[in-house]
């Protein structure tokens, strides 16, 4: 993960938590390893299945400031919190990745979690390559975002040529010394 992507001066009052399994790239490299590298505490709790009530309670009781919530967890939390009661959370950042969240879930996050959700895109072999991160760029709903600092990301068409025009589909090509391939 590029250093520019994480602030190197996070307050020591921060703590991270994720329900994502640490055997998955999202849990391991989006939360656990960067937190430990920067000396930020990580809340750990093993659960047999995701419980939205427990998730809200844990984040509130331990004053979690930063979390990575997979899209499935966010959808379950939204369904659990149908009455739109705002929990007493102190979140500063919420990251998510694995699939597109959609505008409705992004709006719910801003309203109930009281913070914008930063979407990430990547693969196990090349994680966190593109992000829709409101703290370093203007967010565009329903967009994959922009390259994370430290990555050179381009699109190629079926003929293998780089695509320069906007709103075209293609294969994602990543040039970085940061991937796991």
Locate predicted features.
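Conserved AMP-binding/adenylation subdomain of ANL enzymes
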Residues: 1-65, 80
